[in-house]
Amino acid sequence: VTATRVDVIGVPMDLGADRRGVDMGPSAIRYAGLNAAIEALGIPTRDHGNIPVRVAEEASPEEARAKYLPIIAEACELLALQVEAVVREGAFPLVLGGDHSIAIGTLAGVARARGRAPGVIWVDAHGDINTPITSPSGNVHGMPVHFAIEAQSVAPERIVFIGLRDVDAGERRAIRELGVKAFTMSDIDRIGMAAVIAEALAITIDGPGSLHVSFDMDGIDPTEAPGVGTPVRGGISYREAHLLMEAVAASGALGSLEITEINPILDRENQTAILAVELVLSALGKTTL
């Protein structure tokens, strides 16, 4: 990590998802000892608290094809402003979700501050590249890549999906047509995580601070990360996830990171949040030896 300080930003967003509880993710990750663990690596932290997000009870879904989109966009704009300010200060933004719709805000903030779109490694069981028209559910957490590309916060040729195993027909089409590099679990089985990582870094990195990692905890196998709203069997292993994060750290290019989709209601004794903290530490440079 090139920055001298890690700035934590919580986004208690659950309007993009069907199952309630993912708004408690930022608290769960903090309870798992995030800030103290980062400080123990010798990196100062600053916690900005949480971005205000309206709760579902005071809002209406409005447009069925993209439920709560205006309210999600409002929170994402506040997040973008905060992330932009952090990056301009020379600090490292660590964003805690919340559902994956928050990536719209994180990526916008990073792109504005750096004056260009970052390369993005997107770890996820799902494609998250539906449009309001192709989405079967109308849930915005399945659309952030579409909206980020539309806003020019990311270029399709500089985003890499890792861990895909549940992809909608419209998403398959979008991935093909846009030329997005996507590694499914079958690809990881076939060529190994190390080869996947090498290719992903080659595609996404373009100088120091040019890499953003957007990590949906449902990318990991549910036996290791049960506390997610949309679990899919056969995911990334504990060891593969750490290998990825250690490689990201070793690249020296990581400029920002977000962890999304932890749902403490569905978790077992906060194990998914504890794993998230371990993965953050690996991404920030913690190694076994």
Task: Please annotate each region the language model reported.
Residues 2-13, 19-94, 112-113, 181-289:
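Catalytic cores of soluble, metal-dependent hydrolases
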Residues 98, 123-125, 162, 213-217, ...:
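Active-site flanking residues adjacent to catalytic metal/cofactor-binding acidic residues
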Residues 18-20, 105-107, 131-132, 171, ...:
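Short glycine-/acidic-enriched loop or helix-start segments at secondary-structure transitions
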Residues 43, 155-157, 177-180:
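A short helix-to-beta-strand connector/capping loop
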